[in-house]
A protein has these predicted regions:
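Small-residue (G/A/S/T)-rich helix-start motifs and N-terminal tracts that mark the onset
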Residues: 1-13, 18-20, 24, 48, ...
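Nucleotide and nucleotide-moiety/phosphate-recognizing core
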Residues: 1-54, 63-85
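Short gly/ser/thr-rich secondary-structure transition/capping motifs
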Residues: 32-38, 65, 89-93, 156-162
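Alpha-helical segments flanking ligand/cofactor-binding loops in enzyme cores
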Residues: 28, 73, 100, 190-194
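Internal gly/pro-rich beta-alpha loop/helix module
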Residues: 48-50, 55-147
Length: 194
């Protein structure tokens, strides 16, 4: 409608087995909107300006292997910006672990709140810039449960680091005790002190 060419690859269907009822439904939807379905991810690989990953969601807990691992690897090799929907396929939403292989996004559009695995290594490397989009889930929906973690952002800094008096010195605002390192392992202590 806006002059943008869109292609769909049905990642859940292995080549030669495109006979399932879900595949037929997806094919009808694409046909009704005149959206071509491609046979491999590599079809038109140099023409993609945007690659959208929506293969797996936050509930993934098993390792990705076989054909789907190949698809994700092929997607990572495509040109253009890469965007994941909710979480990069192959990333554990709870701990950021890579489950076999993972899509490497430039941006992730996630819903309601960021997922812990998007901020922990190695998941953060695969998530790119995380954009949290509200979808109508209110604080009341959590029935009094508060998140276990929070992400500090630049907008939080003024509250955490109040303006300092120009006549202050290193002893005015308290002192810091660093307990780190061990014999022949002083790297963490040195980094914290700097």
């Amino acid at each position: 409608e806006k002059g943008i060419s869109v292609f769909v690859y049905p990642a859940g269907e292995k080549a030669g087995h495109k006979t399932s009822s879900s595949y037929e439904v997806q094919k009808k939807i694409c046909n009704s909107y005149r959206i071509p379905m491609v046979e491999t991810v590599k079809d038109h690989k140099d023409r993609y300006d945007l690659v959208i990953d929506a293969i797996f969601g936050t509930g993934l807990s098993r390792s990705i292997t076989g054909e789907l691992a190949n698809v994700i690897s092929d997607m990572n090799g495509l040109t253009g910006k890469k965007v994941s929907v909710d979480i990069a396929s192959g990333i554990n939403a709870d701990d950021g672990a890579v489950l076999g292989c993972a899509f490497r996004a430039d941006h992730t559009i996630t819903f309601s709140f960021g997922k812990t695995g998007q901020y922990l290594w190695p998941g953060t490397e695969y998530s790119g810039t995380v954009h949290v989009v509200p979808i109508g889930i209110t604080n009341e929906s959590w029935l009094g449960q508060k998140p276990r973690m929070a992400v500090l952002e630049e907008k939080d800094l003024p509250e955490l680091l109040p303006k300092r008096n120009a006549h202050s010195n290193k002893g005015t605002y308290g002192k810091l005790l660093i307990i780190a390192g061990s014999v022949n392992m002083a790297g963490a202590a040195c980094l914290a002190a700097k």
